[in-house]
Amino acid sequence: MKKFISIGTAIATALLFVAPLPSIAGHWYVGGTLHNATAGEWHKSSYENKLATAANWTLMDPNIRKISNKSSSMETVRPYAIELVACVDQVSAGDSYDKKYVSNLAAACMVSMGW
């Protein structure tokens, strides 16, 4: 009996690392990796990656974070993230921005949009 419990515990533990758990994984705002990217890297990245990264940036603004917390939904952040992606795309267009960090461009966009 003790052997079966050990095997069962081992299997359950292994499943914790393998089986998908209900989490935020797979949502539009998860998985952004462009926080320290250059504009050149930004333009080569997927829209999904840009949007997830922009979601993180938008939540740095206390007013947007407050709106998100009040609604208990990241969907309230989505329009801001979409707008921020569009702004960074537009501002960073052209070869002269390829080596500029998009985090700086995103900050400038947020200021220019009155966030």
Predicted regions and their residues:
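Compact alpha-helical subdomains of small soluble proteins
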Residues: 28-32, 56-115
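N-terminal secretory signal peptides
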Residues: 24-61
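Bacterial N-terminal signal peptides that target proteins for export
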Residues: 1-11
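C-terminal segment of classical bacterial N-terminal signal peptides
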Residues: 15-23
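Alpha-helical interaction segments
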Residues: 7, 18-19, 31-33, 46-47, ...
